[in-house]
């Protein structure tokens, strides 16, 4: 790796990813050509056809009144990147797609903790997708580009950060896999990290992981592939580190040549040391007692009361610095919570480090829903609701991603009352979209195939109460609701949120000497406070046999691999416990709700699709109106027929089969037909859709001569007829059948006994 000046002021660094027999991928970072007025700008290329621009800018002055770091990450998908015109009414890009929002989150999560504490200048990172090979994904390239442009901008940033997707394909972890290669993968994960100096030399500190089993994982495992167990996932994290190191090195080399000098940005610490010492002196004892209260509401009420007392006692001393007092009180709370966990292995609600809160699960809680369930873990309460519909109700996706439709849609709602607060209610925020996507990824690997279950599925997770990991609660509630709706899942899935607390603890040896020891404590089923005050948020979902989804964010500069492996093992123990509780509520698919549509799949020849639809949809619309069934036809000839009752669906199927899969009537067959046309020489009678026969005028009079057909029959009349002859051209001659001579085999024209099966 080296940096080349490809023209004056334009520099390029290259990273080569060697995947052995799976080939190589080349990532190039170029700066100096585009977006020259941004603080830092990088054009990133993946091989030759993938190109995106990342630009980082900073405001000139800080937002002193902010008590948070104002970092904004935006991903702009340009449809010209794929040679397409947007499908919206105005034919231009509008609100960001779900893929773009999820990529924003992937970038934000490792970038945010890498800035200096107390920074209050607005920082904006804008990533624009300029060109995309349809066989590649842009999200991981965007992480690297955002890191590189930020590294060049002269900001107080402790990068660079490398991001890589690794997929387990044929037993090998492949970096930057193509969409085609991912179809053969059992597991893939996006891993971001940075280079650090470890005790044993240079290392890579993992900062963020977003991982999932693929949709066909069970079929691949049945075919002999390695299941993504906890051990395999831990190996994948280690396999990602060399690739991250290569990417970080390329970014750093580019920064060494082209980065602006780091500017002196003012920082605003949350509180001064004097404020902290004062708060600690007046609050430590009482706050320690308050943090042993088990119930969240009672504990919060007592800590709020203590905080008000501290503010009142220190009001005169620190007049005008009330925000600092509040921040110091929070910092003291964090210290006491962590201290108790590390020294006593007890948590603020009295549990041990591996204890799970009280669990409850029930199904069929919403009367008219197709499937519903209520899952509760402690004070976290999730209502899962499943809706089934025709496949044509699948989501249509207009984005740069490889998906164009989505049959399974998981929507997560987090109303403000779930935490006892007030707030805005409306369109989902990025957090809600991210949580819904995580729960969706956890469940996709166990969903039945379209052939086995021809439905579009919408799963909604309502977070009714929140105190730690509503996303993993959503996985559990969704599994229950899907089974209640009659969805034949391949295996039930449960999720659990883990946490990690670490610090240097003073320990005393046998000879009385004291030393500092780095201690890591992994927590099972973390509370909201433990999430906020801990060093790692680690969510794992899976079946009893393997992991289906994983999300990790850490604030540490490295977690020992044995600690991570232990956390995965601890998470599996918890997952198995939760699965047992869920199985007590429901352990196999229920009968489908009477309110859910019954969808039947049939196939018609592709060349018959036009006949089934008819001119301007005339035939299919008539079938829909007359039978009450909903019909959806795919390009390959698959027809989905849905109705809330069996007879309606069967009537529609019979009508479609009569057109597309007709069985020719035979001489001697009898029908109850409808007169559709009269002429001077006879009456045409409809036997089957698209199949008429003629009763000659000489046969209408029952042996008597008649002058005019209309004297005997009119259009719309029902006639019992028998096929007397079928000529070489397929024309059918009919004769009337006497009522008293009609045999039991007489069949309505819509469903002749010998013409359907």
Swiss-Prot record:
Catalytic activity as recorded in UniProt: RNA(n+1) + phosphate = RNA(n) + a ribonucleoside 5'-diphosphate
Alphabetical UniProt keywords: Cytoplasm, Magnesium, Metal-binding, Nucleotidyltransferase, RNA-binding, Transferase
Binding site for Mg(2+): 531, 537
SUPFAM superfamilies: Eukaryotic type KH-domain (KH-domain type I) (SSF54791), Nucleic acid-binding proteins (SSF50249), Polynucleotide phosphorylase/guanosine pentaphosphate synthase (PNPase/GPSI), domain 3 (SSF46915), Ribonuclease PH domain 2-like (SSF55666), Ribosomal protein S5 domain 2-like (SSF54211)
Biological process, per Gene Ontology: mRNA catabolic process; RNA processing
UniProt KW Flavoprotein keyword: no
An annotated GO cellular component: cytosol
Keyword Nucleotidyltransferase: yes
InterPro entries found in the cross-reference section: ExoRNase_PH_dom1, ExoRNase_PH_dom2_sf, GPSI/PNP, KH_dom, KH_dom_type_1, KH_dom_type_1_sf, NA-bd_OB-fold, PNPase
Primary localisation category: cytoplasm
The KH domain, residue ranges: 597-656
Requisite cofactors: Mg(2+)
Alphabetized GO MF terms: 3'-5'-RNA exonuclease activity; magnesium ion binding; polyribonucleotide nucleotidyltransferase activity; RNA binding
Enzyme Commission no: 2.7.7.8
Localization: Cytoplasm
Enzyme class label: transferase
Residue ranges constituting the S1 motif domain according to the UniProt record: 668-737
UniProt-listed SMART domains: KH (SM00322), S1 (SM00316)
Alphabetized CDD domains for the sequence: KH-I_PNPase, RNase_PH_PNPase_2, S1_PNPase
HAMAP family xref list: PNPase
Function: Involved in mRNA degradation. Catalyzes the phosphorolysis of single-stranded polyribonucleotides processively in the 3'- to 5'-direction.
NCBIfam families linked to this entry: polynuc_phos, pppGpp_PNP, PRK11824.1
Membership in a protein family: Belongs to the polyribonucleotide nucleotidyltransferase family.
Protein name: Polyribonucleotide nucleotidyltransferase
Protein species of origin: Mycolicibacterium paratuberculosis (strain ATCC BAA-968 / K-10) (Mycobacterium paratuberculosis)
Gene: pnp
């Amino acid at each position: 790796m080296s940096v080349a000046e490809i023209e004056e002021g334009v520099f390029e660094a290259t990273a080569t990813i060697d995947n052995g027999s799976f080939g190589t991928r080349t990532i190039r970072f170029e700066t100096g050509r585009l977006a020259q007025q941004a603080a830092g700008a990088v054009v990133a290329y993946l091989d030759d056809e993938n190109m995106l621009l990342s630009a980082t800018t900073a405001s000139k002055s800080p937002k002193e009144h902010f008590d948070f770091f104002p970092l904004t990450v935006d991903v702009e998908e340009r449809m010209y990147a794929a040679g397409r015109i947007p499908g919206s009414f105005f034919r231009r890009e509008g609100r960001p797609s779900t893929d773009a929002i999820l990529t924003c989150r992937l970038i934000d999560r490792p970038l945010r903790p890498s800035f200096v504490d107390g920074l209050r200048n607005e920082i904006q990172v804008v990533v624009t997708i300029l060109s995309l090979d349809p066989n590649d994904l842009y999200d991981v390239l965007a992480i690297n580009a955002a890191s590189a442009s930020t590294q060049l901008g002269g900001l107080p940033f402790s990068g660079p950060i490398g991001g890589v997707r690794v997929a387990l394909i044929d037993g090998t972890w492949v970096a930057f896999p193509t969409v085609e290669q991912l179809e053969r993968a059992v597991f893939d994960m996006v891993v971001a990290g940075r280079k650090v100096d470890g005790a044993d030399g240079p290392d890579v500190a993992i900062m963020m992981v977003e991982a999932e089993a693929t949709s066909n994982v069970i079929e691949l495992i049945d075919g002999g592939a390695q299941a993504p167990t906890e051990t395999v996932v831990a190996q994948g994290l280690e396999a990602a580190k060399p690739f991250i190191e290569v990417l970080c090195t390329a970014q750093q080399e580019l920064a060494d040549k082209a980065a602006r000098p780091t500017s002196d940005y003012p920082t605003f610490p949350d509180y001064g040391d004097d404020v902290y010492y004062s708060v600690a002196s007046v609050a430590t004892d009482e706050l320690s007692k308050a943090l042993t209260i088990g119930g969240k509401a009672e504990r919060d009420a007592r800590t709020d009361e203590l905080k008000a007392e501290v503010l009142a006692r220190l009001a005169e001393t620190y007049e005008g610095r009330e925000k600092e007092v509040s921040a110091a009180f929070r910092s003291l709370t964090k210290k006491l919570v962590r201290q108790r966990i590390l020294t006593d292995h007890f948590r603020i609600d009295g549990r041990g480090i591996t204890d799970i809160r009280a669990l409850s699960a029930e199904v069929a809680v919403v009367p008219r829903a197709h499937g519903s369930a209520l899952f509760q873990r402690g004070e976290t309460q999730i209502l899962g609701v499943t809706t089934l519909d025709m496949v044509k109700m699948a989501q249509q996706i207009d984005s740069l991603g490889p998906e164009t439709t989505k049959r399974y849609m998981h929507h997560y709602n987090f109303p403000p009352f779930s935490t006892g607060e007030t707030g805005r209610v409306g369109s989902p925020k990025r957090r809600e979209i991210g949580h819904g996507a995580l729960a969706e990824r956890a469940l996709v690997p166990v969903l039945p195939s379209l052939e086995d279950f021809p439905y579009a599925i919408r799963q909604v997770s309502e977070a009714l109460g929140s105190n730690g990991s509503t996303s993993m609660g959503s996985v559990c509630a969704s599994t229950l609701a899907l089974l209640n709706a009659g969805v034949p899942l391949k295996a039930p899935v449960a999720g659990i949120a883990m946490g990690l607390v670490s610090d240097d603890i003073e320990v005393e040896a046998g000879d009385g000497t004291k030393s500092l020891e780095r201690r890591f404590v992994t927590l099972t089923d973390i509370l909201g406070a433990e999430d906020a005050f801990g060093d790692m948020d680690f969510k794992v979902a899976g079946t009893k046999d393997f992991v289906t989804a994983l999300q990790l964010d850490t604030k540490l500069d490295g977690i020992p691999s044995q600690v991570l492996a232990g956390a995965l093992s601890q998470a599996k123990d918890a997952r198995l416990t939760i699965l047992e509780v869920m199985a007590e509520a429901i352990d196999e698919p229920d009968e489908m709700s009477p309110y859910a549509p019954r969808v039947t799949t049939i196939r018609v020849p592709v060349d018959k699709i036009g006949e089934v639809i008819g001119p301007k949809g005339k035939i299919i619309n008539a079938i829909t109106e007359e039978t009450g069934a909903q019909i959806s036809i795919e390009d390959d000839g698959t027809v989905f027929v849905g109705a809330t009752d069996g007879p309606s669906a069967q009537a529609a199927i019979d009508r479609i089969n009569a057109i597309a899969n007709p069985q020719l009537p035979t001489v001697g067959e009898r029908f109850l037909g409808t007169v559709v046309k009269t002429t001077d020489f006879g009456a045409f009678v409809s036997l089957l859709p698209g199949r008429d026969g003629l009763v000659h005028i000489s046969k209408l009079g029952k042996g008597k001569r008649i002058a005019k057909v209309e004297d005997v029959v009119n259009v719309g009349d029902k006639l019992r007829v028998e096929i007397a002859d079928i000529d070489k051209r397929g024309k059918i001659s009919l004769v009337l059948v006497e009522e008293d001579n009609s045999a039991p085999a007489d069949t309505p024209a819509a469903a002749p006994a010998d013409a359907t099966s």
